[in-house]
Amino acid sequence: MTSNERILQPFTLPNGTELKNRLLMAPMTTCTGYFDGTVTSELVEYYRARAGSIGTIIVECCFIDDYGLAFPGAIGIDNDEKIAGLAKIAEAIKAQGSKAILQIYHGGRMVDPQLIGGRQPVAPSAIAAPREGAAMPRALSGEEVEGMIAKFGDGVRRAILAGFDGVEIHGANTYLIQQFYSPNSNQRDDEWGGSRDNRARFPLAVLDITHKMARQYADDAFIIGYRFSPEEMEVPGIRFDDTMYLLEKLAARGVDYLHFSVGATLRPSIVDTSDPTPLIEKYCAMRSETLAQVPVMGVGGVVNVADAELGLDHGYDLIAVGRACIAYPDWAARIAAGEELELFIDSTQREALHIPEPLWRFSLVEAMIRDMSMGDAKFKPGMFVETVQDDANELVINVSLENDHIADIELAASPVQTVEFTTSFEEIRERILTANTPHVDAISGATSQSEAVKKAVAKAMLKSSKALAAEEGGNDAAPKSYDVVVVGSGGAGLAAAIQAHDEGASVLIVEKMPTIGGNTIKASAGMNAAETRFQRVKGIQDSKELFYQETLKGGHNKNNPQLLRRFVENAPQAIEWLADRGIMLNDITTTGGMSIDRTHRPRDGSAVGGYLISGLVRNITKRGIDVLLDTSVEEILMSGDEVSGVRLVNDEKEVIEVQTKSIVVATGGFSANSAMVVKYRPDLDGFVTTNHKGATGSGIALLERIGAGTVDMGEIQIHPTVEQQTSYLISESIRGGGAILVNQQGNRFFNEMETRDKVSAAIIALPEHYAYIVFDEHVRAKNKAADEYIAKGFVTSASSPRELAEKLGMDYHAFLATLECYNGAVEKQHDEQFGRTTALRAPINEGPFHAIRIAPGVHHTMGGVTINTDGEVLNVDQQPIRGAYAAGEVVGGIHGGNRIGGNAVADIIIFGTLAGHQAAKRARG
């Protein structure tokens, strides 16, 4: 029998159930459930598409208790109402001829409090996971441990009633069952902890109740599997002999298979790194005759027949397949037919492959996505040597190109290279090669280096394309032509480009900076919109009229009423526009000046800017929209009173003319142009700015030269919470999450949720001219941005208010009195001191306690060029300049005398898509 035949032959489990082959789809979290853990139709179709040729599908982990979900969008089996939805998954899989097994789990101390309504996670002991930002769990009482076992039993019963052929007990990945067995997380002194036998009681009890439910509600064919992580890195922690001890006990009680949870089938020890022996070989050598009767399953890195064959040869009986089943729904049929597969996903095929939007954005899936739109791109094959600069070093990059793809990227030897440097280079190299485009996300912690490498690849591609054109007899000096030219690659520019492309226009994006993202990438709070479906799901009652009135009030009634009305009316559609393109802003908070939770942000509560730009860039790449970086627009060319083209200059000092019928200027404001700021606001001389260095007002000057009018140029906003050493903006969502502001004496001094101008003025009026944002662990847990501030060293933390006050040099008694007074206001939902009416969410009483020193900085310029409600640029006589459109901070009039936090992101998407629509409409006739 050949190896291929071995893989595809039926396999009988110890309980007599026959699997049609040895191949299983591994359980992989998709984050595609509804907010309440119920099943979506998209998830049903995802599993239906992957059933059939593969013998068995293990459905992603289901939480058995509403304290147990470890992921946003997780699906649950914690109540009987979930049975109907799960039954749809089971039926979809079984109808195609595959077995359906459901994995059940509880996250324990790995649960983020924000996923369970801000409640404290539970665990065997009150010991936080050894990772940055981990929440402190509450230890389960003895009675609660018994109750938790019963909940696992109820989960098994529901899985049976939903029609599943079996369950897999998730005893791996540091979740609750593993936590009970680990001496790191279980330091109890009762019958559930202490000795290895006591620590094994919980996983064995879960197996026992699973058998009990199977006997009561299922037949003998019901499959019971157990997944385990063979080792832990922590000290103390689970070692391989501990694992073998537990597995022997599980086998003695009866289990139909055991499932290694490792990243690669032949992974060696992560504890004894000097020993290269694969753990599966150790397992086979150490197991008893009883354990040898239990089939063992391997997972990790299986793409082709040879990979599965290697696993069988080393001792696995069954092979679970992960990413390959995502990339190829019919994976088993393909390898049965002898296909050799490459692990990539065509960026245009998400819908065809039935990959849910949340799963599409997972890093492991994103790494497989390849931009197939470059099929039309043609290069002159060869190696191009590019010299670029990151923040600290000059880098020499060798870029090898073939006719239609990027073949390789090499970093020339340099004495400045470190292990960290070369590691991050390899990561960005892999992203670019996999995506076949330089427009990929930078590596976290290595942004400057990543952008330099991306720039080198982009320059090489441009040179190669020009060389090929010259070789084929093309005239490189001849003007290029696009329907729409977008100037600026922040959120407004990218949104305009995507919209114009989707309406049939050919589009060029021109960006003067070396990187995509503009100032949007620094946005933190979120995106305001009223009457959205995400508000309705959360039961938030809101109205567009209230949004309009609060924005008008916040802008001191200086807003252009027509533009503001268009802004408010189009905001919900803008949220949906993003969602339709895979950018989900479905977590909701509030910002200063708003009385309702309407600030939409990413599901995990992280800063909106990077998430938004990453999603928009994926859409740009997917569509094959041309982008020129390090290129400035020197002049907008006119033919009579109409736009006819642009004159560009790149970083090689080449002058390029591009013909176009429509131009969208989305270059941002002028906060980084200190001379321009001081011209209109002399009182702001010396203030730092939160903006990136490209925010110089160049687009305003460009449009003024063709006759554009301007408005509100003296309306410049300072943001109250800026870290002064780095000019880093501290998100308004921290205050919106329940933080307070205190002065150096430890006292509150103003309503933290007032508009930015008023809060800034109050801080400036303090003798010290700075303040502290103070918050506790509850606020930190619900705001992912806070973890970033901690990592950057902005945060002073302490275990108690007294310790925090001492570290900040403030009077402890005054600080404690401040906290007591504020916590009383939260309890009464009434702030007698300063009239705060919003974001009185929870008392500040959960340690550790945190503080960030802040002061105001120049943040937003409300003034800019004049436009009408169609995004057309108006001249000094308020007449449209034909073919000229503008969006984002380059525009004046929308925000009046003060911009509300969360309105800028709404502005760029609303007016960016509007400008893109109108520009394409004009260009296409």
From Swiss-Prot:
Co-factor note (free text): Binds 1 FAD per subunit.
Reactions listed under catalytic activity: succinate + NAD(+) = fumarate + NADH + H(+)
Effect upon mutating T447S: 50% decrease in covalent flavinylation. Shows 40% of wild-type FRD activity
InterPro entries: Aldolase_TIM, FAD-dep_OxRdtase_2_FAD-bd, FAD-oxidoreductase_2, FAD/NAD-bd_sf, Flavocytochrome_c, FMN-bd, OxRdtase_FMN_N, Succ_DH/fumarate_Rdtase_cat_sf
The protein's required cofactors: FAD; FMN
Mutant phenotype after disruption: Cells lacking this gene lack cytoplasmic fumarate reductase activity, while retaining this activity in the membrane fraction.
Effect of A446V: 50% decrease in covalent flavinylation
Modified residues (FMN phosphoryl threonine): T447
Subcellular location: Cytoplasm
E.C. code: 1.3.1.6
Entry comment on modification after translation: Is flavinylated on Thr-447 by ApbE2, encoded in a neighboring gene. Flavinylation is essential for catalytic activity.
Keywords, alphabetical: Cytoplasm, FAD, Flavoprotein, FMN, Oxidoreductase, Phosphoprotein
GO cellular component, one term: cytoplasm
One Pfam family hit: FMN_bind
Record field: transmembrane: none
Residues binding succinate: A525, H719, S731, E732, H859, R899, G902
Positions annotated to bind FAD: A492, E511, N519, T520, A525, G526, V633, H860, E889, A904, V905
Keyword Mitochondrion attributed: no
Catalytic residues in the record: R756 (proton donor)
Single GO term (MF): fumarate reductase (NADH) activity
Protein residues bound to fumarate: A525, S731, E732, H859, R899, G902
Function, in words: Catalyzes the anaerobic reduction of fumarate to succinate. Uses NADH as the inherent electron donor in this process. Is involved in anaerobic fumarate respiration in K.pneumoniae.
This protein's domain notes: Consists of three domains. The first domain of FRD (Oxidored_FMN, PF00724) carries a non-covalently bound FMN and is used for NADH oxidation. The second, FMN_bind domain (PF04205) contains a covalently bound FMN, that acts as an electron carrier between the two other domains of FRD. The C-terminal FAD_binding_2 domain contains a non-covalently bound FAD and forms a site for fumarate reduction.
Recorded family membership: Belongs to the FAD-dependent oxidoreductase 2 family. FRD/SDH subfamily.
NCBIfam families given in the database record: flavo_cyto_c, PRK06481.1
Name of the molecule in the record: NADH:fumarate oxidoreductase
Lineage of the organism: Bacteria, Pseudomonadati, Pseudomonadota, Gammaproteobacteria, Enterobacterales
